[in-house]
């Protein structure tokens, strides 16, 4: 029994505008949002999960705890990705990376950070264009998600962890301490689909270290939970 990562949800003031930006950057396709309240993008590669842009009036108050690392096969590709993102409405963003950084830090039109990684990066060499979801988090939360998704650890050193689906796609990484304090609800969150009995799966996740949120189940029977670091995610039947 397990859960499947089916979507990364992104809160947006203007879901359609933000979806158009990411269509242009990633080359993904618009797709039906089966839950009806957002705009979905479907991957055209082995990423394995959709993006869901959900309407929200909440303001962004801090750096996101998760961001995309986009890969490059050549310096020219890195330059092209950056230029395309800027033309679509992105901007350069300073997170303290310094002038010698070989990756480029950008933000989308609503301020969500992402990186365009330099060519020759060995850690992401086997990954596609979406190389990683790079996250702020503990070693324990990396272990939790490895067990929850049944994805193997592909990195576990100096309190940094990374997992990757056996079917390929991006890595999900957690950088270890120091941690950025969590303020409010995360703008980026996972949607999981239960394979089999949803209540049994909820119990399994709780046994691994998750907790149920205080809110009641949603209209489709979905249940919001938090991982050991307090990050919200939703389990759908």
Predicted features by range, described:
Residues 99-101, 218-220:
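Short, small/polar residue-rich loop motifs at catalytic or cofactor-binding pockets
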Residues 1-34, 41-94, 107-158, 163-216, ...:
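Glyoxalase I/VOC metalloenzyme domain signal
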